Amino acid sequence: MDELKHQVMINQFVLTAGCAADQAKQLLQAAHWQFETALSAFFQETNIPYGHHHQMMCTPANTPATPPNFPDALTMFSRLKASESFNSSSSPSMATSPPPPPVSWGMAPPMANQQSLWTQGPSAQQTHPPPGWPSAVNQQAASEQKASAAMEAER
């Protein structure tokens, strides 16, 4: 049972610390299988051997978070101008936006016989809720219908 427990701890340590399984086993054994103690020892720089320390100091390559050579990137950005176009034709730049389309919705009131798409007209609504509902619900529904009819009349 202890062997299974140790294997689970090693796997958990590998997932947490991102180290190799043999290194995790060594650290856990040195910490008498105390997970937090071994994890603290792993993340302290004094416990990293010199050979591994050099690898940690190198800049990673080919990772999504690694930018290109920074001075070269700055030089490339400094050469860009806001008015430059990526193609050589005399067409306007992609940075300029076309004129907005004319807005037609919301400008004119709806016609008298036209119902709103979002609300149903008074004729389409139920006049009374189902008979099993409490009277308070029936009164609220009636007042909401009156308010809806009043709002439709104002339009």
From Swiss-Prot:
Gene3D superfamilies: DNA helicase RuvA subunit, C-terminal domain. Residues 112-127 have a biased composition (Polar residues). Residues 81-155 are annotated as: Disordered. Residues 83-96, 139-155 have a biased composition (Low complexity). It holds the Pfam family UBA_8. InterPro entries: UBA-like_sf (IPR009060), UBA_8 (IPR054109), UBALD1/2 (IPR039310). Belongs to the UBALD family. PANTHER family: UBA-LIKE DOMAIN-CONTAINING PROTEIN 1, UBA-LIKE DOMAIN-CONTAINING PROTEIN 2. This is UBA-like domain-containing protein 1. The lineage of its organism: Eukaryota, Metazoa, Chordata, Craniata, Vertebrata. The gene is ubald1.
